[in-house]
């Protein structure tokens, strides 16, 4: 016995059903679609109908909601920052622009520094949020933290100010005046 003499077991491989190839084939003329009507024509698909039964899209409840003004916060661990510094992708000063390019994020994203990992050298980090453990580890390594108030997109939209200054500019808090009924 050799490889050239191997064959599949009898009945294991069926021939492909060739539809619409003459009446002698058994699947000619109407090609298994019955006689005339919309269902026999090309392009027909059965509608999502379950007869008299309540359809699934009405049996299942609606749920969930996506906030239109949600903040997309990207987590960045200290271990990632240490790795970037080892590989030469980041210097001892990490800004929001650096984080955007390193994390392949959008300009409208926020960044949160998390405390997973250790820092070997002092780092100056600018981010939107910092966890307590990350803050302790950065300060322990001799680094500094600066919290940004705005996203890159918001900072770029401020006229006559560089992006670095725009990031630090606090947002104006709008307070509604209460109407006093008299």
Curated annotation (Swiss-Prot):
One GO CC term on file: cytosolic large ribosomal subunit
Record-linked InterPro entries: Ribosomal_uL15, Ribosomal_uL15/eL18, Ribosomal_uL15/eL18_sf, Ribosomal_uL15_bac-type, Ribosomal_uL15_CS
Gene Ontology BP terms: translation
Keyword rRNA-binding part of the UniProt annotation: yes
Superkingdom, natural source: Bacteria
Gene Ontology molecular function: any one: rRNA binding
Keywords: Ribonucleoprotein, Ribosomal protein, RNA-binding, rRNA-binding
Biased composition (Gly residues): 21-35
Region feature Disordered, mapped onto this chain: 1-52
Keyword Ribosomal protein: yes
Summary of the function given for this chain in its UniProt record: Binds to the 23S rRNA.
UniProt subunit comment: Part of the 50S ribosomal subunit.
Membership in a protein family: Belongs to the universal ribosomal protein uL15 family.
Listed name of the protein: Large ribosomal subunit protein uL15
Organism: Chlorobium phaeobacteroides (strain BS1)
């Amino acid at each position: 016995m050799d490889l050239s003499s191997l064959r599949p077991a009898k009945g294991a491989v069926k021939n492909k059903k060739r539809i619409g190839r003459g009446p002698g084939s058994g699947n000619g003329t109407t090609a298994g679609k019955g006689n005339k009507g919309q269902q026999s024509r090309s392009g027909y698909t059965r509608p999502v109908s379950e007869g008299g039964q309540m359809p699934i899209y009405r049996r299942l409840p609606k749920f969930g909601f996506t906030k239109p003004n949600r903040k997309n916060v990207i987590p960045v661990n200290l271990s990632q920052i240490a790795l970037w510094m080892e590989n030469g992708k980041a210097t001892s000063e990490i800004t929001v622009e650096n984080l955007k390019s390193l994390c392949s994020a959008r300009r409208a994203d926020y960044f949160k520094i998390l405390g997973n990992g250790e820092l070997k050298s002092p780092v100056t980090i600018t981010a939107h949020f910092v966890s307590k453990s990350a803050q302790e580890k950065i300060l322990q390594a001799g680094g500094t933290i600066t919290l940004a108030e705005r996203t890159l997109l918001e900072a770029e939209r401020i006229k006559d100010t560089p992006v670095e200054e725009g990031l630090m500019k606090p947002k104006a808090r709008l307070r509604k005046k209460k109407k006093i009924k008299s």
